[in-house]
Amino acid sequence: MLFDQIASNKRKTWILLLVFFLLLALVGYAVGYLFIRSGLGGLVIALIIGFIYALSMIFQSTEIVMSMNGAREVDEQTAPDLYHVVEDMALVAQIPMPRVFIIDDPALNAFATGSNPQNAAVAATSGLLAIMNREELEAVMGHEVSHIRNYDIRISTIAVALASAITMLSSMAGRMMWWGGAGRRRSDDDRDGNGLEIIMLVVSLLAIVLAPLAATLVQLAISRQREFLADASSVELTRNPQGMINALDKLDNSKPMSRHVDDASSALYINDPKKGGGFQKLFYTHPPISERIERLKQM
């Protein structure tokens, strides 16, 4: 059951990434069709933009991410309990020892960052260290180490980059339509009098309008799948599903973080640091903790 869940989550993530690339290609084709008379040309430009966005975000410095979240680096002497747990989990996962940071915040939370295991780092809040017992801390750090081992940060970064590229292209198309670019193209098409041209025009406009929302939803779906995968992978490392369940239960009852957390960093944390309600739940980067616990109970 454990390995079935891991395989299923990986498969769903790759399907969602494929959908992402198709969305980017669709928007690029639509913009190219409407404004440069070449759908293929627009598609190529869109893929190049997405690639550049992804590269620039993947190589973002770990120091920048940690600084944005108010984290300070610790070592074996200054935080031995946390350091040794991370060391144990990294050893079991067969990855290099990540750098270790602490965030001074009473809320219970943790995250990992780094585009690959060689430059990875993990961070935990002081509140997490004060409340979690050894088994629960192992489960949380197993979750974060699993993100590193599974290259989740890189995958999530690619998803954010593709979503940003799609939004940028759609916004650019909107401004061009505002200044009359689409109107000139439409006039040319009307003179051609081709029904297929009209259909293509409508489809292109719909793609430009709806793609940013679709991209956001796909990005969130990828983030949720990686959380499920990291939970299951943590159990694989610790061989202790109850430890993960108990940790998640405590995380669920934790208050939001006291410091401001930007949207990009929010997706990194094991527990949504903002904990909004109502309509905001549709755009959560994390699946409900109750659902995560239920999946663990099924193992």
From Swiss-Prot:
Its cofactor is Zn(2+). One of its GO terms (biological process) is proteolysis. Pfam families: Peptidase_M48. It is an enzyme of class 3 (hydrolase). Keywords: Cell membrane, Hydrolase, Membrane, Metal-binding, Metalloprotease, Protease, Transmembrane, Transmembrane helix, Zinc. One of its GO terms (cellular component) is plasma membrane. Binds 1 zinc ion per subunit. GO terms for molecular function: metalloendopeptidase activity; zinc ion binding. InterPro entries: HtpX_protease, Pept_M48_protease_HtpX, Peptidase_M48. It is a multi-pass membrane protein. Zn(2+) binds at H143, H147, E227. The keyword Metal-binding applies. It is found in: Cell membrane. The chain crosses the membrane at residues 15-35, 39-59, 158-178, 198-218. Belongs to the peptidase M48B family. This is Protease HtpX homolog. It comes from Streptococcus pneumoniae serotype 4 (strain ATCC BAA-334 / TIGR4).
